[in-house]
Amino acid sequence: NPDNLPGERKDPYTIILPPPNVTGTLHTGHAIMLAIQDTLIRFKRMQGYKTLWLPGTDHAAIATQSVVEKKIQKEEGKSRHDLGREETLRRINDFALDAQKTIISQFRSMGASLDWSRLAFTIDEKRNLAVRTMFKKMYDDGIIYRGYRIVNWDPKGQTTISDDEIVYQEEKTKLYYLTYG
């Protein structure tokens, strides 16, 4: 916590850790990113800055749901429809919390100088309220609106997904022409 650092500190220097998804464990890319940010925050602290490095994890809703559904299908041969909404949500939440504990443990074992007193989870009450409040404000201001648009539909997940989540696959297929008249 920068408020507990010894001596007189000058300007603040803050890094918000890009929150890893709770879909599994950390990989080499996370470790590299952590090492770079840790080096920056420690260097600025040695220069006398009031440093703050905020930790957190991302619930990654659709991705986490997909991982859990695949696990349930593999281990039990059941779908989310077989389990029902409440049981599926409970299992997704349990998985996410377990993965979050593992990720935090990995961060700590790497010696990251994060301010653990300010740990955030993108679906915790404080963040959830902030997102809903801002979403409503943006809707009221006309920035977010409902319109007729082409969307990416995931038939397996039965939901819309963003362009970033699409895996494009080129295929050679036939093209048919229809002539009218």
What are these model-derived regions, one by one?
Residues N1-G181:
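N-terminal, positively charged nucleic-acid-binding surface of large information/translation enzymes
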